[in-house]
Amino acid sequence: LTEDVYEVDCNWKLAMDTFGETYHFSALHSETLNLQFHGNVQCYDTFGRNHRMLLCKRDIDGMRDKPESEWDITTATLPVYWLFPNVQLMPGAGILFLVRAYPDKERPGKHVSRVHFYVRSEILEDSEIKEIVKEVGKTFAEIIRDEDYLMSASQQRSAESGAIKYSIFGRNEPALHHYHNTYRKMLGMELLPLLETPDR
């Protein structure tokens, strides 16, 4: 239904990181995604080099009062699949978002993202619904561009300045650990070290 192409001032792996956790929703997406999702909870599974996260929608709150037979995963969650090395796939009820990040061959601090929004054909038969769904796809792509990637470009500038020697991923960021350890393993590098804390 829609396709957007963004040239972004951040490395493609940093772009993938933006899809790796949800606790930033209340700060970065306070007027957008935070209104639709609980940012402090998710389900996470790995499948070899790939992974799946289930982002918890606020609509799940209303399911508590329904029998389990009426629960619907696409009402309660948004599944997000990372397909190694550069694809984010987000299926919903009759829709699908596909985000692919491509490195810039000349400039490692830049990349191109292609954001596609697919919709089942029967949904598009109603012209009014088609326009609503089209707006949903456009809005989601703009959130990626204007919120996530804007922050990623800032992080890229910090990384290039040399002021920050390393980043620490928290225990609540399993997807980020998985992304980077998968990349490192494929490059023949040691896995990220785990920091020990006194109480563990």
Predicted regions and their residues:
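C-terminal catalytic domain of Rieske-type non-heme iron oxygenases
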Residues: 1-200
